[in-house]
Regions:
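Bacterial Sec-dependent N-terminal signal peptides
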Residues: 1-6, 16-43
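First exposed extracellular module after export/assembly in secreted or surface-exposed proteins
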Residues: 28-130
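Repetitive helical segments and hydrophobic/amphipathic motifs
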Residues: 11-12
Length: 130
């Protein structure tokens, strides 16, 4: 009887460990996003902060409003959720910009980029032509 109880206990521990591992396999990480005016040039975050000088601060401001870190566009979440949060905030900023009228910005390409942690390069997540 003790052997059966021990076997059941070991099996229960193994199942619990497996469930715990699978539940934590998609842990939250920090993902960084920037807004740029050109999707063909590799840009670092410091360069993209000049985006505000180009007269379109509202997009970046909308993204910062939803960011997990003040002053930056960083989401601590799973990759899929972080990309979705960034795209939603980007879309909100574009919508607010359009509400105010895009004027001379018509035809301008605005790009949302996300950092690929594996390659340390910025990848285009979303692109909008005003």
């Amino acid at each position: 009887m003790k052997k059966v109880f021990a076997l059941v206990a070991v099996c229960c521990l193994a199942v619990t460990a497996a469930l715990f591992t699978s539940c934590n396999s998609d842990q939250k990480s920090s993902y960084q996003y920037i807004v740029a005016l050109d999707d063909t040039v590799e840009q670092d975050p410091a360069m993209c902060m000049q985006f505000e000088l180009n007269g379109l601060p509202i997009i970046k401001a909308e993204m910062e409003k939803t960011s997990d870190q003040a002053g930056s566009i960083i989401y601590k979440d799973t990759k899929a959720n972080a990309d979705k949060r960034a795209k939603d905030a980007f879309a909100s900023g574009i919508a607010k910009l359009r509400e105010g009228g895009i004027g001379s910005y018509a035809g301008l390409i605005v790009v949302l980029k996300g950092m690929d942690n594996d390659t340390n390069k910025w990848n285009v997540i979303d692109r909008v032509t005003l």
